[in-house]
């Protein structure tokens, strides 16, 4: 479908649905068609001229059903938008079409004992504000939790804060079920339990429309946020590693930031020296007493300490200096930087971190996040900053990591599989075939769909009771 055909289809849909909340002004549509893919100079260039033809914000499921029916009737692409905090162009329309702002579907549906079910458009911070008085909090969330939506986390995210305990969002037990709308002439609404629900996780909204997500929660703790500094990188790494591997220390977040990364945190400058390395931790109040001994052992110093309540009141949480917020703070100071995403081996991540830091020197700056993997192993992932020169050199850096047994989750590509070692998953494509048979959801993002005729696809990938 070319641009003129899309404009004609859009005009017919608007004429049929005039009461919906439309955004048609070109500058606003372009702005709403953007996320944080500009962290990557490669994606920034590739996606520069990509945008939707219109944006619409449904107020409820009934309006969304009308939109889906209309888009299927006119074969117009439909792309879902949450908080637009993604980093890989997850929401950027490759073939124009309708961008659906899901933030109108923002209600808590149910809160139980350690379980919450909410609509996809709700912000993660709003979920926690609701669950906290009942003694619960999210198990894992990105550093963008104040803006990011639940559906965006599910469809385009990984995990983040809390993953030191519960692993990534897709680890068994974190997601309990999802409610999904199909992209069909007569849309169906399906309840899909885990583990089948995870076939729609991190699929960029390309194989189903997430309406609700049911999550297991974590017990609420009185958290202390700390930033401790070290003169020696190995001391900082050893401190963070000891912290991570102490099961009795109750924690929510743990990140290692090599110099000069802490100096990019302009709001914290003056608390430490520019050449010092930092460890940011979020630790339960009852466990904080152990920090003093660990700091003394590894020659560290306390630079910032605040309670989580103080951080919320000031809108100044140290959690917003971790994960890809680190990259954002750095880019505000030095726009020539970019980053890579690495996954170290849980059996020897400590040595790998040291070796790779020594190998690249100042060209690649260590930003390490500690977490559990899906099997429960304590390990480390990196969002290392890179002094960007050329795309060729950036690719060489990623190859070097791989050659040293460090996995790369490439953040400089927009197709789902290319960010995950290039692996096409037939089961994910099968779900798209069943829930989006015309291929209208976020077209171009799922490479497996382009080669679906060469794959052996499951006739019932979700084990649906009506099939």
Located regions from the model:
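N-terminal flexible segment immediately upstream of the FAD-binding catalytic core
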Residues: 1-69, 85-114, 261-269, 313-334, ...
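Short amphipathic alpha-helices in soluble, non-transmembrane regions
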Residues: 13, 71, 239-245, 287-301, ...
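General beta-strand structural signal in soluble alpha/beta enzymes
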Residues: 22-26, 57-58, 78-82, 100-102, ...
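Conserved glycine-rich FAD pyrophosphate-binding loop
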Residues: 76, 83, 90-97, 103, ...
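FAD-binding subdomain of flavoenzyme oxidoreductases
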Residues: 109, 124-125, 129-248, 458-467
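Glycine-rich, acidic
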Residues: 238-268, 303-323
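A conserved active-site cap/scaffold subdomain adjacent to cofactor or substrate pockets
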Residues: 260-305
